[in-house]
Amino acid sequence: MNTRPTAHKFSIERKQVLAADYLLSLPPGYGADTTKRWPLILFLHGAGERGTNLNIVAKHGPTKIEAAKNNFIIVSPQCPDGKIWSNDLLLALLDDIEKRYAVDTKRVYLTGLSMGGFGTWNLGLSHPERFAAIAPVCGGGQTIQITLAQYFDAATMANYKRMGIWAFHGGKDTTVTPDESEHMVGALKKAGCTDVKLTIYPEAQHDSWTKTYANPELFTWFLEHTR
């Protein structure tokens, strides 16, 4: 009997249905000038807002903030109960929104809190070519993504260095500890990324998103970045 390993191939085609409910906020004046393209924010909520009630998606995040509502198209999808954010779903939704609305595809921004902060790190680092800047709030990610890009994927690494990254965390967060953000930001800086920064609120616990989204500087910073 031959015990040497032999080469084989495997292939299977599966149909995938991607569906999501989402809130859409259009800025005042949208549509008045049919040639104008608008910047877009994709917002990912936390674990507590999962389900089928879209009203709770608006509980936190940029849809409550005038500086965001007045200047951006804001897309806020809802993650189903028991699930986490899917990159395939979010990219398909983003593709659809960009086709149906007057989106400036060079000014697409990504942010999210807690579970959505993890989703922001994951989607932003997996597809940096889609975003001008990202702002993960009280999240974390896999530094191995950065290491692999640094040594094996020059194109992705170039996109990391181009993309603005501003992370936020509460210094007293025990739900997602601040070292999660510190590790990600540290790995990016070590890899040569310069447009990356971290804001720690020393006295904040898990809710670091209220201060973050209430600060108009975040939305000004977004608009300073283009892809």
Which role does the model predict for each range below?
Residues 40, 44-91:
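Active-site machinery of serine-nucleophile hydrolases
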Residues 1-40, 123, 146-147, 182-186, ...:
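A domain-start/cap signature at the N-terminus of enzymes
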Residues 53-66, 89-93, 118-121, 141-158, ...:
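Alpha-helical scaffolding within the catalytic cores
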Residues 133, 138-216:
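The feature captures the conserved acid-bearing segment of alpha/beta-hydrolase catalytic domains
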Residues 100, 106-159:
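Primarily recognizes the serine-hydrolase "nucleophile elbow" in alpha/beta-hydrolase
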Residues 28-36, 82-115, 128-130:
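Gly/Ser-rich "nucleophile elbow"/oxyanion-hole loop immediately N-terminal to the catalytic nucleophile
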Residues 39, 72, 107, 132, ...:
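Alpha/beta-hydrolase fold active-site loops
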Residues 46-50, 79-84, 114-118, 140-143, ...:
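Solvent-exposed loop/turn segments at secondary-structure junctions
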